[in-house]
Design a protein with these regions (language model features):
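Basic, flexible Lys/Arg- and Gly-enriched helix-loop patches that mediate nucleic-acid binding at interfaces
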Residues: 1-217
């Protein structure tokens, strides 16, 4: 949005991502709409490793994603937005903003989430077509989605899948429906928020353009 010239501060177009803004006293607009400050809350993106649960506590004694937070965030009421499976890696948003978390999790928004799956063997084109069109999971058809083969050999395939739903273990179950096992799964984006170069097991605060995007959903 910033690079596209759609953001103004006090009436002046901003095109540099590193622009400093006095969020309390400046008038910020995106596509002509005033954006109210949301930086009073904390907004983080994490590269979640497998072996952690996306809850604030776990009655089975497993490690939670909050255990990965740096000390400076430990006394904040931070919680994950949505979930990644225990054995799935990748992008997870964490925040103190309950309203935003509820908005992002609501099915009506249908925010695209992109995953990269490592699958045993190759997936024939007819099966890829089935996945794109929708398959039956737990008695309910999945919505149409994007499926792209990134690379493949006789042993494994790397396949990018973009879905707009958030059903439990959806990507894994989609491949199970065509008799393929996912051996590794990583989420790489949520809408326009991308994992980027965040190292595994660490967090980074969202940039102003990323929080602006979330505020407009």
């Amino acid at each position: 949005l910033v690079l596209a010239g759609k953001v103004t501060v006090d009436g002046k177009k901003v095109t540099e991502l590193s622009t400093d803004v006095d969020i309390e006293n400046s008038r910020v607009t995106v596509n002509g709409k005033i954006v109210h400050p949301i930086n009073k809350h904390i907004y983080l993106k994490m590269n979640k490793p497998k072996g952690y649960v996306c809850t604030t506590s776990d009655d089975k004694g497993r490690k939670t994603v909050l255990d990965l937070l740096p000390e400076k965030y430990r006394d904040k009421r931070i919680f994950p937005v949505g979930r990644l499976d225990y054995d799935t890696e990748g992008l997870l948003i964490l925040t103190t903003d309950g309203d935003l978390a509820q908005k992002l999790s609501h099915p009506s928004h249908e925010i695209a989430k992109t995953y990269v799956a490592k699958v045993e063997g190759t997936v024939p084109e007819p099966d890829l077509a089935k996945l794109r069109k929708g398959v039956m999971i737990d008695g309910v058809m999945t919505k149409k989605c994007k499926v792209k083969v990134l690379e493949k050999d006789e042993h494994f395939s790397r396949i990018e899948v973009t879905i707009s739903e958030g059903r439990n273990r959806q990507v894994r179950k989609m491949f199970e429906s065509v008799e393929k096992e996912v051996v590794f799964l990583k989420r790489v984006s949520i809408g326009e928020i991308r994992l980027g170069g965040v190292p595994r097991g660490t967090v980074r605060e969202l940039r102003p353009d990323e929080t602006e995007y979330l505020s407009l959903i």
